[in-house]
Every structure is written in C-alpha cells, then in structure tokens.
C-alpha cells in the first residue's frame, strides 16, 4: 500500500501566524546538484510544539502507529520552514535518508503561481496535491516528489520528517 494522504489540518489564520513568525528570520540557501532547499535557521521548537502535536495526532490516526517523542521535545524531529521564490524549484527526489520514513508538509500560503507539489507512485504515476492553505500531506519518504518552478510569488511550507526509530506500529485489536 502506498501512503499518500492529505487533509486540511490548520486554519488560514493559523498558517498566517506561523508564516508571520518566520517571515523576517534569516533563511539559509542550501544548494546541491539536484535540489534547491531553503530552511529557517531559527525554528523555535518549544513554541511550535502545537504544530508538531497536530501533525503527530493526524499521522498516528491515519497510519495506526505510535510516534515516540522523548521528553515531549520536538528536537527529535526535522522541522523546517521552506520558502520558494520566483524561479525556484525542487527537482524530483526522495527523502529516505537519515532513517526518514514519512514526510509531512503544511502549505502556509497560496499567493504564488506555479510551484505544483507532485508525488510519484513507484510506477511513476502522478498523485495530485490540493494547494489549499492549511492542507497537510503525508507520504512515504521513499516516494519521489518535486515542486515545479515558481513563476510568481513565494510558496511557503512547514516540513516535518519522522524517523524509523520514532515509530512503533500498534497492534490490531481485532487480532
């Protein structure tokens, strides 16, 4: 079974609060041969725990798993704000490095053109993503995906990666 789920988990107002919190923070640009990645240097893990908690509850319910968080700390997770500006893109790649099992994202705005988020099945079929503010997606880190070129505006998302060591599969109570 391929895991690719999406659901609106955050209100437009909540997304605006998250975006405003980081809008003036310095952004590091990291480039490699295949991707362009932007991440905030100053994520406040304690203040942003409510965002992570909402993701965790959704992921646990969707996949019937338990995600372990040591000492209620979000520092065990990769947690990024990523912004793409006109001309930016994120070429086709997968995220199954550093023991990542699942990737989650939250779309914070829709004031951009282009920037389509595309996830591919193992047979290279495209799975659509709804570009609605507050929409979250969850997919297996091994699935290829990309963000097409931003034509206009800025596309901002929160990204969270869950690692294998944090996941315990729940037993089916019917068995």
Question: What function would you assign to each model-found segment?
Answer:
Residues 1-73, 175:
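Non-heme Fe(II)/2-oxoglutarate
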Residues 56, 60, 64-175:
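Catalytic core of non-heme Fe(II) oxygenases with the double-stranded beta-helix
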């Amino acid at each position: 079974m391929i895991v690719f789920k999406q659901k609106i988990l955050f209100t437009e107002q909540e997304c605006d609060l998250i975006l405003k919190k980081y809008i003036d923070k310095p952004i590091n640009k990291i480039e490699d041969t295949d991707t362009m990645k932007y991440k905030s240097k100053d994520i406040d893990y304690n203040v942003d725990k409510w965002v992570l908690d909402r993701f965790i509850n959704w992921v646990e319910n969707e996949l019937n798993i338990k995600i372990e968080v040591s000492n209620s700390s979000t520092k065990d997770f990769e947690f990024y704000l990523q912004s793409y500006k006109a001309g930016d893109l994120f070429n086709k790649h997968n995220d199954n490095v550093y023991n990542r099992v699942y990737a989650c994202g939250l779309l914070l705005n829709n004031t951009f053109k282009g920037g389509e988020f595309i996830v591919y099945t193992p047979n290279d079929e495209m799975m659509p993503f709804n570009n609605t503010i507050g929409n979250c997606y969850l997919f297996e880190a091994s699935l290829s995906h990309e963000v097409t070129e931003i034509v206009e505006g800025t596309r901002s998302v929160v990204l969270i990666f869950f690692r294998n060591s944090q996941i315990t599969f729940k037993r089916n109570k019917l068995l």
